[in-house]
Amino acid sequence: MANDRRVSRVSSLIKREVSQMLLMEIKDDRVGAGMVSVTDVDLSHDLQHAKIFVSIYGNEDAKAETMAGLKASAGFVRRELGQRIRLRRTPEVVFLEDSSLERGDRMLHLLDHIKTDRPPEDDDSEEE
């Protein structure tokens, strides 16, 4: 088992390398259907499993198509990681959609909606 600092370092290396692969090397047309960015990599403590969280911008059809393309290219990504990062064993790669940005945007929209619907507070109670 690796210590937390090593896990963090390897995780950031994987994030950087996969981001480069998404920009330049993955040739699957489905991956280009939506704009994709790597938001986080969750690496197990034994460095055997990597969950790669991606944010996909586009409509639902483009998101589904992009996720299918990413899942199909997981073997290529794993092989490339094995060549670029010197590890004893290359982790198994799983792509997951990260919808935290959309949830955060929706929460901000709801808070703005509540703020505009609330009547202004009166200071009449302080005058008494």
Curated annotation (Swiss-Prot):
Matches recorded under SUPFAM superfamilies: Ribosome-binding factor A, RbfA
Location relative to the cell: Cytoplasm
GO CC entries: cytosol
One of the GO BP terms on file: maturation of SSU-rRNA
Record flagged with keyword Transcription: no
Major location category of this protein: cytoplasm
UniProt keyword annotations, A-Z: Cytoplasm, Ribosome biogenesis
Gene Ontology terms, MF aspect: ribosomal small subunit binding
Keyword Glycoprotein carried by entry: no
A Pfam family this chain is assigned to: RBFA
PROSITE patterns from the UniProt entry: RBFA (PS01319)
Cross-referenced InterPro entries: KH_dom-like_a/b, RbfA, RbfA_dom_sf, Ribosome-bd_factorA_CS
Similarity comment text for this entry: Belongs to the RbfA family.
Described purpose of this protein according to its UniProt entry: One of several proteins that assist in the late maturation steps of the functional core of the 30S ribosomal subunit. Associates with free 30S ribosomal subunits (but not with 30S subunits that are part of 70S ribosomes or polysomes). Required for efficient processing of 16S rRNA. May interact with the 5'-terminal helix region of 16S rRNA.
Subunit structure, as described in the record: Monomer. Binds 30S ribosomal subunits, but not 50S ribosomal subunits or 70S ribosomes.
Name of the protein in its database record: Ribosome-binding factor A
Organism per entry: Microcystis aeruginosa (strain NIES-843 / IAM M-2473)
